[in-house]
């Protein structure tokens, strides 16, 4: 019996919404993107619940099980290091000092979570799409 295919989720925590996408092992989108309220001002636990809701909607729409998600890419609108938020930025005060990466990974059954800030995520995404045409990329955001 062959192993079921694995998928990866991308979750973008914004000031008002969480935007999410599911991709296959080749990086091709599977199903539709999902957007839910982020609830960042209500605290990180409220947002973790919204992230899980987005994952459930993504997997349900694609007809896959959550245990088929091999990894999650998570971006946050704040500076962080090693998964720990170190400045409030667009988040509520309870985010500062929180290891978002590890806590969210624990909530979703130990699935690896790879986290960066939203600016780095935007640059990495643009580079991934355009690297066939350009050798370098400079991203300037307002």
How should these model regions be labeled?
Residues 24, 36, 61, 128-139:
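Bacterial carbohydrate/catabolite-sensing allosteric modules
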Residues 44-52, 67-72, 78-136:
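Glycine-rich phosphate-binding loop and adjoining helix at the ATP-binding site
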Residues 51-61:
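Alpha-helical scaffold within the catalytic cores of cyclic-nucleotide enzymes
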Residues 25, 118, 142:
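Cofactor-binding loop segments of dinucleotide-utilizing enzymes, especially the Rossmann-like FAD-
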Residues 14, 75-76:
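A secondary-structure boundary/capping signal
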Residues 10, 116, 139:
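Generic enzyme active-site microenvironment
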Residues 2-49, 53, 85-87:
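Short glycine-rich, Thr/Ser-proximal phosphate-binding strand/loop in the N-terminal lobe
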């Amino acid at each position: 019996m062959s192993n079921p295919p694995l998928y990866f989720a991308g979750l973008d925590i914004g000031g008002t919404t969480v935007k999410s996408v599911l991709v296959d092992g080749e990086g091709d989108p599977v199903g539709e993107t999902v957007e839910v309220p982020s609830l960042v001002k209500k605290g990180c636990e409220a947002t973790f619940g919204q992230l899980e809701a987005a994952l459930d909607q993504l997997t349900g729409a694609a007809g896959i099980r959550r245990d088929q998600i091999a990894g999650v890419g998570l971006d946050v609108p704040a500076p962080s290091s090693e998964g720990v938020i170190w400045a409030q930025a667009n988040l509520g005060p309870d985010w500062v000092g929180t290891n978002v990466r590890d806590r969210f990974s624990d909530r979703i059954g130990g699935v690896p979570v790879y986290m960066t800030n939203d600016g780095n995520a935007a640059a990495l995404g643009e580079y991934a799409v355009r690297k066939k045409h350009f050798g370098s990329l400079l991203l300037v955001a307002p």
